[in-house]
Amino acid sequence: MAAASSSDSDACGAESNEANSKWLDAHYDPMANIHTFSACLALADLHGDGEYKLVVGDLGPGGQQPRLKVLKGPLVMTESPLPALPAAAATFLMEQHEPRTPALALASGPCVYVYKNLRPYFKFSLPQLPPNPLEQDLWNQAKEDRIDPLTLKEMLESIRETAEEPLSIQSLRFLQLELSEMEAFVNQHKSNSIKRQTVITTMTTLKKNLADEDAVSCLVLGTENKELLVLDPEAFTILAKMSLPSVPVFLEVSGQFDVEFRLAAACRNGNIYILRRDSKHPKYCIELSAQPVGLIRVHKVLVVGSTQDSLHGFTHKGKKLWTVQMPAAILTMNLLEQHSRGLQAVMAGLANGEVRIYRDKALLNVIHTPDAVTSLCFGRYGREDNTLIMTTRGGGLIIKILKRTAVFVEGGSEVGPPPAQAMKLNVPRKTRLYVDQTLREREAGTAMHRAFQTDLYLLRLRAARAYLQALESSLSPLSTTAREPLKLHAVVQGLGPTFKLTLHLQNTSTTRPVLGLLVCFLYNEALYSLPRAFFKVPLLVPGLNYPLETFVESLSNKGISDIIKVLVLREGQSAPLLSAHVNMPGSEGLAAA
């Protein structure tokens, strides 16, 4: 009976969780064999029949056999191989003519493959880059048999380590060969011209001149050679080219190309760069404390996921608005946009099998999945508006549909005031002393305020006098004179009885070096012993930090500590330029003994 009642309660709990969920489980196939990420998912009405399909740039198991898949419902409708791993997929309108069927763009390697009605329409290739002159000269020598393959390999490895420009594909393949295969490779390819080709790292779309959903859009490409390219949607020519300090990995755009637009690029150096129309270089820079794993624009806020398991919100000018800590590592991110309710939120797939939905820093919903989610896509699928499509780390496919009655509220599924609001505070009772002090403040409030102001003015006066005295007697670790702009910083290391005292002396001048300085230590000789209490300072070059080290021996076995004064003087002068008081720690070594 106990077991039966337990199973009944579990079944009731599962039914109640399903009833309280905002999502309907439409499909789950753990063996769908789809390996991709969010940038390679796109939803579009590819045939103009009102039936939205899912476009997947599939990496294949283990990154082998990349393919372009188009799904209708839970089934794969078409499948075609790709020459290289896909980087991004996007759908866009190329022209205003009827019927207005969107085209599909798939970035793979150095090319963008454009499909219309799922048939190949156009192939755009990135322009070739000029080869490294040294690399070109080496292959010319190999062509004339002036160098052997082993020397060619050594020289190419030297160029790869020192040159800023990467080697060509031909040279990189040659460096991967065994010694026995090199000669045949050189004989086969030495007559070929050296070609250096970059690849596409990310892609998105930008409206051309109208903000409507069915307006013509341009393709925006991020490349491995730290450039952003904007392509014309009809002629596929380069309309604009922008340079970045690093390789872009995520892109977000807003506005129209012909009017005004903002472009945010998250790069491999951990920074986000903001560019505007007619700017060849970034206008703003957002420095992150960790590498970005996703970039989503929600209204006017840039939401960034980082490898520190956190979401950050920034303005387009780089001001941080908020930070939310995640319970696990972020694997993927995408935008959830519910047009019927005007909702925009961020979806984050975590390594612990959760998909969290946030509006700003407020948690709206948590979805638990049987496996970690690696890609997310939300939109119209089939003929259902609000459909969430997820692929898992093991290649599974999950499709959920948002209920029409579902309303996202802050705090997940909790509705109403938080539970802490109903708790009564433990307010202490009013004592006789509290009542007397309150009456005194009411009766003598003016006199108390005047007394406070008088004491405050005296405190400021004493602080100013002490500061002036410190400046006049050089009792500060910063020099205030223009002739010797110095900065002193002292660090004590060790447990005792021998301590290491390191003085960091820096010349803060911009152009003039400093010479002829002395360092003097003043200390209690009954407590401490120094091998050198007075020594000369070498030439101080502007801007460099000079560590000056010495050792301090503690002579007391009672754990007593004192202050050691450090003075920096000009040779031939008795007044110090600057000074520092070092609070020595107690000797733990002697105390333990």
UniProtKB/Swiss-Prot annotation:
Tissues where this protein is expressed? Highly expressed in the kidney. Also found in fetal tissue, testis, retina, adipose tissue, heart, skeletal muscle and pancreas.
- Tell me where it mainly resides: membrane
Q: Which GO molecular function, any one, fits this protein according to its record? A: patched binding
Q: Which residues form a coiled coil?
A: none
Q: Which Gene Ontology cellular component terms are annotated?
A: axoneme; BBSome; centriolar satellite; centrosome; ciliary membrane; cytosol; motile cilium
Looking up Pfam families in the UniProt record yields:
BBS1, GAE_BBS1
**Gene Ontology biological process terms in this record:** adult behavior; brain morphogenesis; cartilage development; cerebral cortex development; cilium assembly; dendrite development; fat cell differentiation; fertilization
Compartment(s) where it occurs, according to its Swiss-Prot or TrEMBL record: Cell projection, Cilium membrane; Cytoplasm; Cytoplasm, Cytoskeleton, Microtubule organizing center, Centrosome, Centriolar satellite
Residues carrying N-acetylalanine: 2
List keywords of the entry alphabetically: Acetylation, Bardet-Biedl syndrome, Cell membrane, Cell projection, Ciliopathy, Cilium, Cilium biogenesis/degradation, Cytoplasm, Cytoskeleton, Disease variant, Intellectual disability, Membrane, Obesity, Olfaction, Protein transport, Sensory transduction, Transport, Vision
Q: Which PANTHER family match?
A: BARDET-BIEDL SYNDROME 1 PROTEIN
Entry function: The BBSome complex is thought to function as a coat complex required for sorting of specific membrane proteins to the primary cilia. The BBSome complex is required for ciliogenesis but is dispensable for centriolar satellite function. This ciliogenic function is mediated in part by the Rab8 GDP/GTP exchange factor, which localizes to the basal body and contacts the BBSome. Rab8(GTP) enters the primary cilium and promotes extension of the ciliary membrane.
Q: Which disease is it linked to?
A: Ciliary dysfunction leads to a broad spectrum of disorders, collectively termed ciliopathies. Overlapping clinical features include retinal degeneration, renal cystic disease, skeletal abnormalities, fibrosis of various organ, and a complex range of anatomical and functional defects of the central and peripheral nervous system. The ciliopathy range of diseases includes Meckel-Gruber syndrome, Bardet-Biedl syndrome, Joubert syndrome, nephronophtisis, Senior-Loken syndrome, and Jeune asphyxiating thoracic dystrophy among others.
Assembly: Part of BBSome complex, that contains BBS1, BBS2, BBS4, BBS5, BBS7, BBS8/TTC8, BBS9 and BBIP10. Interacts with the C-terminus of RAB3IP. Interacts with CCDC28B and ALDOB. Interacts with PKD1.
Q: What is this protein called?
A: BBSome complex member BBS1
- What organism does the record attribute this protein to? Homo sapiens (Human)
